[in-house]
Amino acid sequence: QVSIVFTEIKLSQFYGIELDDFAHEMAILSLWLAEHQMNKVFIDELHDYGRAKPILPLKEAGHITRGNATRLDWKIACPIDLADEVYILGNPPYIGSRKQKNEQKEDLKIVFSSLKKYKDLDYISIWFYKSAEYIRSLNAKCAFVSTNSICQGEQVSLLWPHIFGLDVKINF
């Protein structure tokens, strides 16, 4: 007897946060395109044994929240259970402390108000800290496109003790 295999990866398993309206819509469109492409690869690789549910008409496209990731509660925007296996991937904005706009400085203040010298942090440090809070004690990992400055100079003493204090494992 021949068994048919269905793909187990669904768009409903994808979550994200995007600030810009156009980028938010592009993220949703990109998920639909990626699903279509991966379903085709899945079916082609398994020949007559693989199936994927049709994606037309377009329905759910993941859970992409339009909002400011620095101010949202990630566990509400991207719910997680203890049994979940989660990967956070991103390309957050790098903006040095002297090039930040007032709104970005306010974002830093909201996240790091308990730190004396939070104003000297790079903007991207918010994503590192919030992701460490999010993955703490869970089966989760995060990876970001970043600059090496997050691990050099004054950033090290300002940011990393607080991330290490969350007892997360860091891989390089």
Regions found by a protein language model. Name each.
Residues 1-172:
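SAM-dependent methyltransferase catalytic region
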